[in-house]
Amino acid sequence: YQRSYRPPDRDDEHGRIWRVTATGRPLLKKPTLTGLSTAQLVKRLESPVRWERRMVRQLLRDVDTDDLVASVHAWLNADAQIGDHEIFKALSVLESAEHVDEALLRRLLTVKDYRGRAYAARVAGRWSDRLKDPLALLEICVQDEHPRVRLEAIVAASDSQDPQAIK
């Protein structure tokens, strides 16, 4: 319950003052993202700061699709240390650009983290009208060891217009 007395740190004009920054460390500086090339923006997807990654994804929505696809593939191929999460980020950026990349989708289906595989199943359902054989991808997902991946595959199969999807 809330105390009935007024706290001494109350601001008479704006109400309570809440601390929204961590004490003992400086504020993060907002990076200047405008004016960066597409390749530089894609590289910024590796940032540990969630706000920066979110702003980068918003800026990448306005980039030419061909340039975006080339930059994403160059980013994935340049670093041998690309992890599961980076593959997920790459596919999500290409999905927001409405660019179907079946090879990257298949690559995400093989990652260790079940969340990446579940996302790949969801994307396979969304792209079912544009993939060569979406049901083959969903069959892989239905046989996955994790229940969330199997569930996403079933939901994705419901998006398919193919009568074989019911099997």
Question: How would you label these PLM feature ranges?
Answer:
Residues M55-R57, I87-A90, A120, A153:
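Conserved hydrophobic register position within alpha-solenoid helical repeats
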Residues S37-I87:
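Long hydrophobic segments that form regular secondary structure
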Residues E52-R53, D84-I87, R117, R150, ...:
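Residue-level detector of extended alpha-helical repeat arrays and alpha-solenoid scaffolds
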Residues L33-V42, T65-N77, E98-T110, D129-Q143, ...:
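Amphipathic alpha-helical scaffolding segments comprising HEAT/armadillo-like alpha-solenoid repeats
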Residues Y1-R6, A136-K167:
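Repeat-solenoid scaffold signature
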